[in-house]
UniProtKB/Swiss-Prot annotation:
Its EC number is 1.3.1.98. The keyword Oxidoreductase applies. The gene is murB. It comes from the Bacteria. It is an enzyme of class 1 (oxidoreductase). This is UDP-N-acetylenolpyruvoylglucosamine reductase. Cell wall formation. Belongs to the MurB family.
Length: 346
């Protein structure tokens, strides 16, 4: 186990690039080290921050507790049968690198999730999703360290209680389970998921008349994301800042009467998912800036650190967007990233 570092700068560990320090910081390179970490005098399960890629957090002030950076790596095949392969990835693996690894192995199901920032360990927490695929569609099980019993446990897909950008790990399991690895069920036979029009068009162009491959889909997703989303290494951001709101069919019908071109996605339960980026764009907020934080000029769903943004700049900008969208559409937006501490959340 690496030694604890004190007063550690967390700016490189959060993709929005907010300036903050950790009172204490330690890197976890092997899951077994968790048994030692929970016995450290600096450890308090109520205040510890389990940190992955830092792509889904907003550090609003210096972190008063212990920060554990998950750096455990490794990918291995567990089982293979009937066109299905179970593959385990450690929590510290970079998500996009893992997706590319699976595609290169001919394992299918992750390609639509290419270029999502963060680590494998974060994928079940947020139930990450893009272009018609969510993590829950491919996760077989999640291996965790249970802080209640200080033992390793395996949770099935059903145990994780996945929902849209939600999971057990954000609800009643928050603060109890530390994700150490994720097992994915991937297919050896490729069936493309091209329900989104811009993705279908991009794949058709790449495949040029031949049968498309998973690599074609992955490459197309990367091209689309790169054209719309800023690179966090160049311009700090946390990807999509707001969840796509889900409204009743009646509410959607009312909005459609006034906005017939409004994108909408009917859900199996009869509700309708709306495009948060479209709602923000209709309020003419692209490029709008408060302090050093701004709405990206090409993608309204992304807030960026344009000029050494402070935590307060980000909060004020997010609040302005929420109020403006609600005033026009009577639809409430909710932020995707986690505000730390949670008392700052809107």
């Amino acid at each position: 186990m690496q030694p604890i570092r004190y007063r550690t700068d967390l700016t490189p560990y959060n993709t929005f690039g907010l300036r903050a320090q950790a009172r204490a910081f330690i890197a976890l390179e092997h899951a077994d080290g968790l048994r030692d970490i929970v016995r450290l005098p600096e450890f308090n399960r109520d205040t510890v921050l389990w940190l992955g890629g830092g792509s889904n957090i907003l550090l609003m002030e210096d972190y008063a507790g212990l920060v554990v950076h998950m750096e455990n790596k490794g990918i291995r095949e567990i089982a293979r049968s009937d066109g299905m392969v179970l593959i385990e990835a450690q929590a510290g693996e970079i998500w996009h690198d893992f997706v590319l690894h699976a595609v290169a192995l001919g394992l299918n199901g992750l390609e639509n999730l290419s270029l999502i920032p963060g680590t494998v360990g974060a994928s079940p927490v947020q139930n990450i999703g893009a272009y018609g695929v969510e993590a829950k569609d491919v996760i077989h099980s999640v291996r965790c360290f249970d802080l209640d019993t200080e033992t390793f446990v395996t949770l099935s897909n059903a145990d994780c209680r996945f929902a849209y950008r939600e999971s057990l790990f954000k609800q009643e399991g928050k603060g109890r389970y530390v994700i150490v690895s994720v097992v994915f069920a991937l297919k050896t036979h490729f069936v493309p998921n091209l329900g989104y029009g811009d993705l279908a068009a991009a794949v058709a162009e790449l495949s040029a008349g031949r049968v498309p491959t998973a690599k074609d889909v992955s490459d197309a997703v990367c091209a689309i994301r790169n054209s719309k989303l800023p690179n966090p290494n160049v311009l700090g951001n946390v990807g999509s800042f707001f969840k796509n709101p889900v409204v009743s069919a009646e509410k959607a019908a009312t909005l459609l009467q006034r906005h017939p071109d409004m994108p909408r996605y009917p859900q199996p339960d009869g509700s309708v998912k709306l495009a948060a980026g479209w709602l923000i764009d209709q309020c003419r907020l692209k490029g709008f800036q408060i302090g050093g934080a701004a709405v990206h000029d090409r993608q309204a769903l992304v807030l960026v650190n344009k000029n050494n943004a402070s935590a307060n700049d980000v909060r004020q900008l997010a609040q302005h967007i929420k109020f403006t969208v609600f005033a026009r559409f009577q639809v409430e937006l909710h932020a995707e990233p986690n505000w730390l501490p949670a008392s700052f959340s809107l």
